[in-house]
Regions:
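Conserved loop-alpha-helix segment in the C-terminal half of the alpha/beta-hydrolase fold
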Residues: 94-142
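Flexible "cap/lid" loop of the alpha/beta hydrolase fold
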Residues: 1-33
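Hydrophobic "lid"/C-terminal helical patch
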Residues: 154, 158, 162
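Alpha/beta-hydrolase
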Residues: 28-115
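Nucleotide-sugar-dependent glycosyltransferase donor-binding/catalytic pocket residues
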Residues: 4, 109, 144-147
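Short, glycine/charged-enriched secondary-structure capping and boundary segments
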Residues: 9-14, 115-119, 151-154
Length: 164
């Protein structure tokens, strides 16, 4: 989830959003497949060199000159004009009728943007409790990109969840 917001943040958020629309973002290119892998590992030191190369082949493509370009939409870098209204989100979550698998990473960095660990842990637990049928799991030795860090462990959790 995202950090709570307050209405007083709206004017600056709209200004930031409009500024970012005026100056559209772009995706950086890289000189080689190995440079893409290095960039992935810079963001995620748990990523093995082999897995980083594998992901590079799926995350970026080379052009005719040999430069590698990330296959992402640069617009995802633009801040949302709308504030994250936690209570509205939770009202929606209360209406979920399907079972939910909530997976967390042992080395998450959610504390960096949501606040002190003890407070955030309590807030995450509060949010999770509104989901009528939720099963939680923790993946060891994984961070924010847990699907990159421990894909086999995540796949096992999902498979077990789906057959229950």
């Amino acid at each position: 989830g995202l950090a709570n917001t307050v209405p007083a943040q709206a004017p600056n958020r709209y200004a930031q959003w409009l500024d970012e629309l005026r100056e559209p973002p772009s995706m950086r290119s890289y000189p080689s497949r190995e440079a893409v892998a290095e960039r992935l590992r810079k963001n995620n030191p748990r990523l093995t060199p082999e897995r980083a190369i594998f992901l590079s082949d799926h995350w970026a493509v080379p052009d005719a000159q040999g430069a590698w370009h990330v296959q992402g939409d640069p617009k995802h870098k633009i801040v949302s004009a709308n504030l994250y209204r936690t209570e509205e989100v939770l009202a929606c979550w209360q209406q979920i009728t399907a079972p939910v698998l909530w997976v967390e990473a042992e080395h998450t960095d959610v504390w960096r943007w949501m606040g002190p660990k003890a407070e955030v842990r309590a807030e995450i637990d509060r949010r999770m409790r509104v989901i009528p049928d939720v099963r939680s799991a923790l993946i060891k030795d994984a961070g924010h990109m847990l699907h990159h860090d421990q894909p086999e462990a995540l796949a096992h959790l999902i498979e077990d969840f789906l057959i229950r």
